[in-house]
């Protein structure tokens, strides 16, 4: 058996053993302007995407915007005239999505985008930052948001309310919510747990605000590269049960407020060139993860996928498309109405869980529970019982008899059934 372990390679694992393509494939190139666009054969070409023919500025913008509109039109999930909660973060792909929505709303009746956008900026900038730095980042993002002139609202992660971005007390609001969130977050020991906690709370906050603003759809700006990272991260985190919905075009775990990812077919190269050739100069900000320098499963996965994107861009697309072939069981909310559950309250020390709960969904991520008959949970529970019940002074016959009883108790506990004799019997 090989004695080489992952630690022998440092943080990058065994990635250094992969042979890099030589030379690395060119992602895109700017043409000299003498070659005509292969699409319209009229205007001079200004760029050439990887594995694409040279294009002029107008044909490129039409191509990218068509991919965005085609994702919405092909599925027909978003109904005409629907109120849509568009999530703002200020990143490059997020700004591109907002510009595409603005462009679609300005078109003539036949090509017009038939939605009513409502933009929300859910700030996470208080995580890992001092208050002075937080204020500066929020002000910069609000400035970027105002360039689109949409009706916009502001909130913070973990909050249940939102206010208009024009509010004069915007930067001072939600002090209690920020303090509560940071206090709970500080209770997690690893960066992996903290990053996962932020992701799940972000989704829950968006659903709560969507309900407040009466928006049945939520638009996210995740592109294919982001979803490839999410797919592999979820596998590493053991979230395979919800993996398909976490990267799907439509996440319908909550049928009243569906999460839509209309940018999933775009890649970083198209985003970069869109910003360069857009009709208007677009401002954006590079997002910084407060835990990017910490060792975590998510960070290692992101580093691995970013490396693939630089040297094997087609492989990233293959990883992302693999998720489209997966299916996931969805469970409707029960009468307990866990959609209104305050997610942060699950980590309150004074919380008392209802032992008679009949919920079939996880209250944290709203995925279908799959603990019944789980061999993994059985092994963990059986090991715990052996550690707490077996006494070295017992005879062989007593240990065998106790083991049989513990196997049955472990199965019952995994399936949520009562175990006779209490915890230490």
From Swiss-Prot:
Q: Which GO terms describe its cellular component?
A: cytosol
Q: Where is the composition biased (Acidic residues)?
A: 1-11
- Family matches, as InterPro entries: CTU2, Rossmann-like_a/b/a_fold
Give the originating organism: Culex quinquefasciatus (Southern house mosquito)
Q: Which GO terms describe its biological process?
A: protein urmylation; tRNA thio-modification; tRNA wobble position uridine thiolation; tRNA wobble uridine modification
Q: Where is this region: Disordered?
A: 1-22, 404-425
Task: Please list the residue ranges that the record marks as compositionally biased, kind Basic and acidic residues.
Answer: 13-22, 404-416
Q: Which family does it belong to?
A: Belongs to the CTU2/NCS2 family.
Q: Which UniProt keywords apply?
A: Cytoplasm, tRNA processing
Q: Which GO terms describe its molecular function?
A: nucleotidyltransferase activity; sulfurtransferase activity; tRNA binding
Q: Write one Pfam family the protein is assigned to.
A: CTU2
The molecule here is called: Cytoplasmic tRNA 2-thiolation protein 2
Indicate whether Cytoplasm appears among the record's keywords.
Answer: yes
- HAMAP family listed in its UniProt record: CTU2
Main location, first listed in the record: cytoplasm
Query: Where is this protein found?
Result: Cytoplasm
Write out the pathway annotation from the protein's UniProt entry: tRNA modification; 5-methoxycarbonylmethyl-2-thiouridine-tRNA biosynthesis
């Amino acid at each position: 058996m090989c004695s080489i372990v992952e630690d022998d390679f440092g943080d990058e694992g065994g990635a250094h053993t992969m042979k890099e393509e030589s030379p690395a494939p060119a992602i895109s190139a700017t043409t000299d302007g003498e070659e005509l666009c292969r699409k319209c054969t009229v205007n001079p070409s200004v760029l050439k995407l990887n594995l694409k023919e040279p294009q002029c500025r107008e044909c490129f913008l039409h191509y990218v915007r068509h991919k965005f509109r085609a994702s919405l039109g092909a599925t027909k999930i978003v109904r005409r005239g629907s109120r849509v909660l568009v999530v703002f973060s200020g990143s490059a792909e997020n700004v591109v999505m907002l510009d595409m929505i603005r462009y679609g709303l300005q078109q003539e009746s036949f090509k017009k985008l038939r939605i009513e956008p409502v933009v929300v900026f859910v700030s996470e900038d208080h995580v890992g930052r001092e208050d002075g730095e937080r204020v500066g980042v929020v002000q910069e993002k609000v400035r970027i948001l105002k360039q689109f002139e949409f009706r916009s609202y502001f909130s913070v992660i973990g909050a249940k309310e939102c206010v208009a971005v024009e509010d004069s007390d915007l930067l001072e609001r939600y002090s209690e919510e920020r303090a509560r969130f940071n206090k709970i977050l500080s209770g997690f020991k690893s960066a992996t747990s903290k990053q996962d906690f932020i992701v799940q709370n972000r989704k829950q906050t968006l659903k709560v605000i969507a309900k407040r603003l009466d928006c049945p759809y939520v638009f996210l700006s995740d592109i294919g590269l982001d979803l490839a990272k999410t797919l592999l991260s979820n596998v590493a985190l053991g979230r395979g049960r919800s993996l398909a919905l976490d990267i799907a075009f439509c996440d319908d775990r909550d049928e009243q407020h569906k999460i839509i990812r209309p940018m999933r077919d775009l890649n970083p190269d198209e985003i970069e060139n869109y910003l360069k050739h857009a009709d208007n100069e677009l401002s954006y900000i590079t997002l910084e993860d407060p835990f990017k320098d910490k060792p975590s499963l998510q960070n290692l996965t992101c580093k691995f996928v970013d490396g693939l994107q630089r040297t094997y861009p087609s492989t990233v697309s293959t990883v992302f498309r693999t998720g489209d072939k997966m299916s996931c069981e969805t469970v409707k909310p029960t009468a307990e109405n866990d959609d209104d559950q305050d997610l942060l309250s699950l980590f309150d020390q004074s919380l008392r869980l209802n032992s008679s709960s009949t919920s079939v969904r996880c209250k944290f991520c709203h995925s279908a529970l799959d603990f019944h008959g789980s061999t993994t949970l059985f092994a963990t529970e059986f090991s715990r019982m052996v550690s707490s019940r077996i006494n070295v002074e017992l005879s062989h016959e007593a240990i065998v008899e106790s083991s049989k009883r513990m196997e049955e108790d472990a199965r019952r506990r995994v399936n949520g059934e009562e175990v006779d004799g209490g915890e230490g019997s």
